[in-house]
């Protein structure tokens, strides 16, 4: 797909990296299994949900191919959610978790945030909400309109994982052209100039993430879409005790926005 987009030529040509990422997204969107994973977790407690109760929710494997069916994801009183999906003092057009506002928990219920708990350093350690039992996915009440949907995993029914967030190696679009300019400006050798262009965030390892148990059956190099995050594959370093995932590409072109 990438070759089809850029065309065929016998001449040296520079193509935007975003074109390659776009082709990869298009390919993986068609064949990657969807799962929920929480990379920067904070605990979400549904205070009016019965303690000890567990429900099985259905999640679609791949909306591009309904014939691939669904899988089960457990729902319980205590969940992990993304820390970035909560804001205590949110701006007007913030549609995720904030006190007094409703959001939909994907494949589950609509909940209303009631507050949070902080530690002595002022860091949020728990988020609290109440659920509406009539809004379970598939019930008539689920049709109630809310503007935000967030993903989650059950604290008692998930796997611990390490996630390796690979990104672009270079900070510049064309390292070859930038190399000479940096060497001249800083009066340095080629190796030093190359180091100037390396993206310090080209690899970010997150050791304490959580993913739904369904991913345990995936073989090394299997592709997954972490919903709302990006496309990942199972690393060969994975073990039954702790899985390891590598990011192939995000859902959106972040670099394109930065450059604008």
What annotation goes with each model-predicted range?
Residues 1-260:
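Polyanion-binding catalytic cores of nucleic-acid enzymes and NTP/SAM-utilizing transferases
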